[in-house]
Amino acid sequence: ALAAARLEQLLEEFNITRLREAPAMALSGGERRRCEIARALAAHPSIMLLDEPFAGIDPISIADIRALVVQLRDRDIGVLITDHNVRETLDIVDRACIIYDGRVLFEGTPEALVADETVRRVYLGEGFAL
C-alpha cells in the first residue's frame, strides 16, 4: 500500500501519470528523464547521479530538468551531474569539476571555473560566455 501511494505521488509530482502504461521507446527524451528521476526517488536516496541529463532533449525539457535538479537540491538530496552541456549545468550547481585527459583539471565554484584561464584554453574556449 505504501509503495502504491509513493508511486502515485511521484507520477503526479513529475507530471507523468499519463505515461504509466507507455513503453519506454515511445517516450521523448524529456519524458524519459522525468521517469528516470522519479524512479530513482522511489528509493528515497540521499544522493543522485544524473549522467548527461541534458543530452538529446529539447529546450523546454532542459528547463524542466533544471527545475527538477533545483527541487532535488531543495530536498537536501545531493546531485552529481556528469554532462558536457556546461551552459545548462553551471548555474544550477554549487561546485563544478572539469576532468581533462583523465585527471581533474579544475574543481571549484562555477564562477571560478569560467574565469580560469587553463579551463578556458583547453575546454570552454576563449570566447565562452554564460
PLM region descriptions:
Residues A1-L19, V70:
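Conserved ABC ATPase "signature" region
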Residues P23-L27, E31:
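Conserved ABC ATPase signature
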Residues I37:
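Hydrophobic anchor residue at the start of the ABC signature
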Residues H44:
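Conserved catalytic motifs of ABC-family nucleotide-binding domains
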Residues M48-E52:
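Catalytic Walker B motif of ABC-type/P-loop ATPase nucleotide-binding domains
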Residues A63-R75:
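Helical segment within the ABC ATPase nucleotide-binding domain
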